[in-house]
Amino acid sequence: FPLVRYRTRDITRLIPEPCRCGRTHIRMGRVTGRSDDMLIIRGVNVFPSQVEAVLVGVEGLEPHYRLIVDREGTLDTLEIQVELSEKLFSGSGEIRALQNIELQLKKDMKDYLGINAIVKLVEPRTIERSEGKASRVIDRRVL
């Protein structure tokens, strides 16, 4: 039978186990990213979707972020700018809460991505919004 192939650049996985509905064909899992979104930073493949997965689990953040890749000397650096939620600015102890969020994000990014990243918390509504696909990566490296 014919096999139709498309080069979508979607990253997913094949699931060989039968479906609960009884079908026995190989299934495709959820799309976890796109190969054309991949960044290579110090030899590590980093996808914006990985960063987003870490950010979703942190209270007090908005779903708006920007990745800035730069080169200092011979090393690539990754800076992650994340918008804070306005809810954080409604009570006391804001500075301590912000410091805790920043430290936790740095640790989580290291654990999940395998590289150290610079984490910068930015004020609400400072990261550009776009109508179409969000442009989340700024690559300043001269390759």
Each model region followed by its residue ranges:
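Active-site glycine/GP-rich loop and adjacent strand/helix microenvironment
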Residues: F1-L143
